[in-house]
Amino acid sequence: MGEKPGTRVFKKSSPNCKLTVYLGKRDFVDHLDKVDPVDGVVLVDPDYLKDRKVFVTLTCAFRYGREDLDVLGLSFRKDLFIATYQAFPPVPNPPRPPTRLQDRLLRKLGQHAHPFFFTIPQNLPCSVTLQPGPEDTGKACGVDFEIRAFCAKSLEEKSHKRNSVRLVIRKVQFAPEKPGPQPSAETTRHFLMSDRSLHLEASLDKELYYHGEPLNVNVHVTNNSTKTVKKIKVSVRQYADICLFSTAQYKCPVAQLEQDDQVSPSSTFCKVYTITPLLSDNREKRGLALDGKLKHEDTNLASSTIVKEGANKEVLGILVSYRVKVKLVVSRGGDVSVELPFVLMHPKPHDHIPLPRPQSAAPETDVPVDTNLIEFDTNYATDDDIVFEDFARLRLKGMKDDDYDDQLC
């Protein structure tokens, strides 16, 4: 009988190993009515701290331009949210009681460990990365959340990468428990100089799909016209609403299917088409919205964004949606089409069950995982199941970490 798995805690140290941040998770779920709180612990070397303070910041930023173009003080980045927490010495206000995880970490790490706590506002966007082009370098565009811990006499004092800890977390959403109604759409096209029509009806078998799941598109055509339907095209399109200084919408096909199914005049046609949107088929498309990712980890197409009813429509960031388009290619022009909106997301994981591996992830033989698990002895029986794991990433062969501040001790 195997041992009970321990509580996994992520840790990351500054390059000089004087400061270490501990977090219970890297993904924080937006439940629409609330967002998981960010609770962690920072451990500092007292000889290094001296008379300085320990600060922790949480930043949500939208990078909308290449990092190598940040010149002359002009940055293609907008901070959507910044919060600061003074972990040590504690502020005079009544301290917030530590969470259960923080309490266990404080007992295990000792007197030089200090808790910090953040509440993520509900109106902030989820983590989304825009897929870079083959020649793009530096940080990818998109929305990300970053925690930074450092020692300084004041917030205005400039901190250096060597003595600070920076780690990226994600704000995510999971599929709702109750999906919406089955999507369906229909249209009738009347042609010039004719009273006979072409009717198209399409539907999906459900509204909610998980990443990697095929979509079944039911197409029904009633052709009472004198024209012939030469082809039927089915495509899945991703729509990304970029809300920053102004709102712009970008669409990108992520799956396409074309069949030479003909529908003659005065006849009917019915068929179910199966199509699957996958990131693996869209690796070269620059600007495609992907789920926010930690560096050198694989990911998937961006999940649909769910906005709470009555929420502020002017939320800054990237709002993602999907539609299936069914198009009839008609002889002598006059094509007919309909669109079916649907939701593409990850299922809500059960407690203590990790998020399923992305469908587009590389084989395990190609992506060695450096978890560097460390388990410490303790006198507290309730703390025996804590397992510390470096805030590591999946290393891809042939790639190296070019950010000095991402090196782990």
Swiss-Prot record:
A motif ([DE]-X(1,2)-F-X-X-[FL]-X-X-X-R motif) lies at residues 385-395. The modification Phosphothreonine is found at residue 382. Belongs to the arrestin family. Phosphorylated at Thr-382 in the cytoplasm; probably dephosphorylated at the plasma membrane. The phosphorylation does not regulate internalization and recycling of ADRB2, interaction with clathrin or AP2B1. Keywords: Cell membrane, Coated pit, Cytoplasm, Cytoplasmic vesicle, Hydroxylation, Membrane, Nucleus, Phosphoprotein, Protein transport, Signal transduction inhibitor, Transport, Ubl conjugation. The modification Hydroxyproline is found at residues 176, 181. The modification Phosphotyrosine is found at residue 48. This is Beta-arrestin-2. The modification Phosphoserine is found at residue 360. The keyword Transferase does not apply. InterPro entries: Arrestin (IPR000698), Arrestin-like_C (IPR014752), Arrestin-like_N (IPR011021), Arrestin_C-like (IPR011022), Arrestin_CS (IPR017864), Arrestin_N (IPR014753), Ig_E-set (IPR014756). GO terms for biological process: adult walking behavior; cell chemotaxis; desensitization of G protein-coupled receptor signaling pathway; excitatory postsynaptic potential; G protein-coupled dopamine receptor signaling pathway; G protein-coupled receptor internalization; negative regulation of canonical NF-kappaB signal transduction; negative regulation of interleukin-1 beta production. It is found in: Cytoplasm; Nucleus; Cell membrane; Membrane, Clathrin-coated pit. The keyword Ubl conjugation applies. Residues 363-409 are annotated as: Interaction with AP2B1. It comes from the Eukaryota. Functions in regulating agonist-mediated G-protein coupled receptor (GPCR) signaling by mediating both receptor desensitization and resensitization processes. During homologous desensitization, beta-arrestins bind to the GPRK-phosphorylated receptor and sterically preclude its coupling to the cognate G-protein; the binding appears to require additional receptor determinants exposed only in the active receptor conformation. One of its GO terms (cellular component) is glutamatergic synapse. GO terms for molecular function: angiotensin receptor binding; D1 dopamine receptor binding; enzyme binding; G protein-coupled receptor binding; molecular adaptor activity; protein kinase B binding; signaling receptor binding; ubiquitin protein ligase binding. It comes from Homo sapiens. Homooligomer; the self-association is mediated by InsP6-binding. Heterooligomer with ARRB1; the association is mediated by InsP6-binding. Interacts with ADRB2 and CHRM2. Interacts with PDE4A. Interacts with PDE4D. Interacts with MAPK10, MAPK1 and MAPK3. Interacts with DRD2. Interacts with FSHR. Interacts with CLTC. Interacts with HTR2C. Interacts with CCR5. Interacts with CXCR4. Interacts with SRC. Interacts with DUSP16; the interaction is interrupted by stimulation of AGTR1 and activation of MAPK10. Interacts with CHUK; the interaction is enhanced stimulation of ADRB2. Interacts with RELA. The [DE]-X(1,2)-F-X-X-[FL]-X-X-X-R motif mediates interaction the AP-2 complex subunit AP2B1. Transmembrane segments: none annotated. Residues 240-409 are annotated as: Interaction with TRAF6.
